[in-house]
A protein has these predicted regions:
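N-terminal cationic and glycine-rich segments that engage phosphates or anionic surfaces
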Residues: 1-126, 130-140, 250-251
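Positively charged, low-complexity, intrinsically disordered RNA-binding extensions
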Residues: 140-251
Length: 251
């Protein structure tokens, strides 16, 4: 798991009572509304909607909120029609590659906010294609490792269409093609496994190790500021932070 994924997991676990929860649910709802608007209300034939729903479930968004967002998107919601997906790419401190996915109704505002975050944190916002070649789109499902038989987990994951299972600390990371996200989660849950999270992500082909606290803090400040931007849905980066450094930064 990349350092960004580990950091996101730490914030996820700490975030149940966090003041950002309302903002997070608003972002998740917006993603569901727009996905349903653009691709229809049936997740089976709408990969973007599948991902939006899986991500919302991973953050314990109530089922009724998810259903309400789908209904809004499949109706005549003017807000949904006004939003578009925009991808931004750039470099952070220490040459870390960063991809930002946003849903916006005002490109100029969003670009300004994201550029400000990069500039403030020793980064540079680049042009389209600047860093995307360093990543590949994958589905990632996380399962707590406690009490799990790895061989049985691999079989269940394969039944759902996964092509790799890795143990990372106290969590199994199940990797699959993007279109198999929902089927992998369903297969694991049907086999009795607890799914901690499941979403589409950009997996770095190579990573940059941030081996000291100072370097890690600089990059994480940029990631946090980008994720706190209202229009931003996802941030992906290719850094890796050793466990002991990440624990020190998170404490």
């Amino acid at each position: 798991m990349s350092g960004h994924s580990k950091w996101s997991s730490i914030k996820h676990k700490k975030g149940a009572a966090d003041a950002r929860r309302g903002q997070l649910f608003s972002k998740l709802s917006r993603a569901i509304i727009v996905a349903a608007r653009e691709g229809g209300p049936d997740p089976a034939g709408n990969l973007a909607l599948q991902n939006a729903i899986e991500k919302a479930r991973s953050y314990s968004m109530p089922k009724e909120n998810i259903e309400r967002a789908i209904a809004r998107g499949s109706g005549t919601d003017a807000d949904a029609a006004s939003y578009e997906t925009v991808i931004y790419e750039g470099y952070g401190p220490n040459g870390v590659a960063v991809i930002v996915e946003a849903l916006t109704d005002n490109r100029n505002r969003t670009a300004s906010d994201i550029r400000h975050a990069f500039d403030k944190n020793d980064g540079n916002l680049g042009t389209s294609g600047a860093v995307s070649w360093l990543f590949e789109r994958r589905a990632i499902v996380l399962v707590p490792s406690e009490g799990v038989d790895e061989d049985e987990l691999i079989l269940a994951a394969a039944d759902g269409g996964a092509d790799d299972v890795k143990l990372d600390g106290s969590t199994y990371q199940i990797v699959a093609p993007p279109e198999n996200l929902a089927s992998v989660r369903q297969a694991l849950e049907a086999a009795g496994y607890t799914v901690e999270s499941g979403e589409l992500t950009m997996v770095p082909k190579t990573t940059i190790e941030l081996a000291d606290e100072s370097a890690a803090k600089k990059v994480l400040r940029l990631i946090d500021q980008l994720e706190d931007t209202d229009d931003v849905q996802d941030v992906f980066a290719n850094f890796d932070i050793p466990e002991q450094v990440l624990e020190a930064v998170a404490s």
